[in-house]
């Protein structure tokens, strides 16, 4: 028709293809933008770990074990079940044993944490080795921390009391008797050290 610009079939197909391509690219981009989760809230916490003070920026959803392993590099604490049942992640929080997979990092703000790395020179570790307590070793750090809490709170614990205190720590290698023997050996070592300290202390003369 006169006065009207004719569009060739080739130009029509080229234009249609470009429009379809642009729409196809735009849809995933819009979907990605819509699906992007909002940034998780973060909190600054002050925490003392094995006697060293730390300031951490943590997401409010992080667990204590995540903060220890992924952000402080303390990988001695293990993640086992990750649901507060096996005890592999046990640490001491203000001296009390807790499952660090079930504790939010923000709950530790202003508090003191001890991990297995803090027991490097503890006689309890030597007793565990001497009595072949670790087998595969995965649960050992949690077993150590529960045993440490027991001997700190009750140095004269009986075997039955030790068994009860360790009940929250699962050992898939069934090395329970070895762990109890190691605890008894550590108790004996503590008593000997206490006796030696008393013997070497200068006597007071009135």
Residue locations for each model-derived region?
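Signature of N-terminal electron-transfer/Fe-S-associated modules in redox systems
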Residues: 2-206
């Amino acid at each position: 028709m006169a006065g009207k610009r004719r569009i060739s079939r080739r130009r029509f197909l080229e234009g249609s293809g470009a429009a379809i391509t642009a729409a196809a690219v735009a849809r995933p981009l819009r979907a990605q933008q819509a699906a992007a989760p909002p940034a998780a809230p973060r909190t600054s916490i002050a925490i003392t770990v094995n006697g060293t003070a730390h300031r951490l920026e943590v997401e409010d959803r992080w667990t204590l074990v995540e903060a220890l392993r992924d952000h402080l590099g303390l990988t001695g604490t293990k993640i086992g079940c990750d649901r507060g049942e096996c005890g592999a992640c046990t640490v001491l929080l203000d001296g009390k044993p807790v499952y660090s997979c079930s504790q939010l990092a923000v709950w530790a703000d202003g508090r003191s944490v001890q991990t297995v790395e803090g027991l490097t020179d503890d006689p309890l570790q030597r007793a565990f080795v001497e009595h072949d307590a670790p087998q595969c070793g995965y649960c050992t750090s949690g077993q150590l921390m529960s045993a440490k809490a027991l001997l700190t709170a009750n140095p004269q614990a009986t075997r039955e009391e030790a068994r009860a205190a360790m009940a929250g720590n699962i050992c898939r290698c069934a090395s329970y008797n070895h762990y109890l023997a190691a605890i008894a050996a550590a108790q004996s070592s503590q008593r000997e050290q206490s006796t030696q300290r008393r013997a070497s202390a200068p006597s007071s003369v009135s």
